[in-house]
Amino acid sequence: MFRRLLIATVVGILAAFAVAGFRHAMLLLEWLFLNNDSGSLVNAATNLSPWRRLLTPALGGLAAGLLLMGWQKFTQQRPHAPTDYMEALQTDGQFDYAASLVKSLASLLVVTSGSAIGREGAMILLAALAASCFAQRFTPRQEWKLWIACGAAAGMAAAYRAPLAGSLFIAEVLFGTMMLASLGPVIISAVVALLVSNLINHSDALLYSVQLSVTVQARDYALIISTGVLAGLCGPLLLTLMNACHRGFVSLKLAPPWQLALGGLIVGLLSLFTPAVWGNGYSTVQSFLTAPPLLMIIAGIFLCKLFAVLASSGSGAPGGVFTPTLFIGLAIGMLYGRSLGLWFPDGEEITLLLGLTGMATLLAATTHAPIMSTLMICEMTGEYQLLPGLLIACVIASVISRTLHRDSIYRQHTAKHS
């Protein structure tokens, strides 16, 4: 047991450095090509001329597509081993390391050029890769899946500063690939990754800064639960739209570079209306949480961002949709809150409360992981007073979504790439 805890600690350290490496590579490319040192792609887009704002995501998609197509031609065959940690956990616990690194580099290109796709997917993949590489060298074969799971959880903890949610991500989303009794090493890896990440970044701040002064009462619980019902209906719709967009891009029968370039061009066109569509949505979420906009502004940014996410994910841009889903949930919750705020004197607090609820419940509706989704929002914002209400709402959202749409976003992703 002591040996496993020691290895879990090493995996956590490796994962933290893998995440930090990807993050610093992003910052370097943004500084080189966008003259942006703020770390915010929305700020970068705001400072660009309209034509550069239009073309940059398309050029990034084109470069990523050329890289992926070039690698396919170089290998002359599909890789025998997976390039995704979920696939690796469902098979024999092995990666195609070279192909996975190429995929991560392609993700780096599309993320730093403004595509509306999550950077955290590549971070978690690199963390799992680092764990797998270490495991194959120093541990027996039957433990490889466990250490990949530890790496994925640690990567999630370092990326989102949410070690408990990262651990439960393994238990809920990847349930069946490992025993719950093995969660001890997973939790150790996640916590160590968070601590090392804090040391690297010289900060232990929460991912999102929220000033929620409301004390949750009976009325608020009713509003939270009703938001869960709304998210349970919206989750399957979002998954259906993503699947339809992917099929639409595939039906065009474009070569990968042109398909990714088209997705990037759509993002560029949308960014002419609002630069908030650039990136994974982190900075937009923070600005909404700091000062919730008016209803029409939320609606406009929401529609543009939704189309940008659909274009990016549908075109096959390598990256995650976890953080974009958080923004979509926030916007849905805030739109609902703004509508209800007309009837209550404390409309601003209701809007913020239901925005946070929307983040958790839409995440639960798309991942079918209510406990992880609840803890994720609490850990990212520090608003643990919301935990009881969010847990009920997330369970409701997950049940409704699972009834209407059998597959979660991760099962849908695996089926799409199998």
Curated annotation (Swiss-Prot):
UniProtKB keywords: Cell inner membrane, Cell membrane, Chloride, Chloride channel, Ion channel, Ion transport, Membrane, Transmembrane, Transmembrane helix, Transport, Voltage-gated channel
Domain of life: Bacteria
Gene Ontology terms, MF aspect: voltage-gated chloride channel activity
GO cellular component, one term: plasma membrane
Membrane topology reported for the UniProt record: Multi-pass membrane protein
Transmembrane regions: 5-25, 54-74, 146-166, 168-188, 222-242, 258-278, 291-311, 316-336, 352-372, 380-400
Main location: membrane
Transmembrane is among the record's keywords: yes
InterPro entries, sorted: Cl-channel_core, Cl-channel_volt-gated_ClcB, ClC, ClC-type_chloride_channel
Short name of any one Pfam family annotated for the protein: Voltage_CLC
Gene3D superfamilies, A to Z: Clc chloride channel
Keyword Ion transport: yes
UniProt-listed SUPFAM superfamilies: Clc chloride channel (SSF81340)
Subcellular location: Cell inner membrane
GO biological process terms, semicolon-separated: response to acidic pH
Role description: Probably acts as an electrical shunt for an outwardly-directed proton pump that is linked to amino acid decarboxylation, as part of the extreme acid resistance (XAR) response.
Family as reported in the entry's similarity comment: Belongs to the chloride channel (TC 2.A.49) family. ClcB subfamily.
HAMAP family: CLC_ClcB
PANTHER family: CHLORIDE CHANNEL PROTEIN CLC-E
Name under which the protein is recorded: Voltage-gated ClC-type chloride channel ClcB
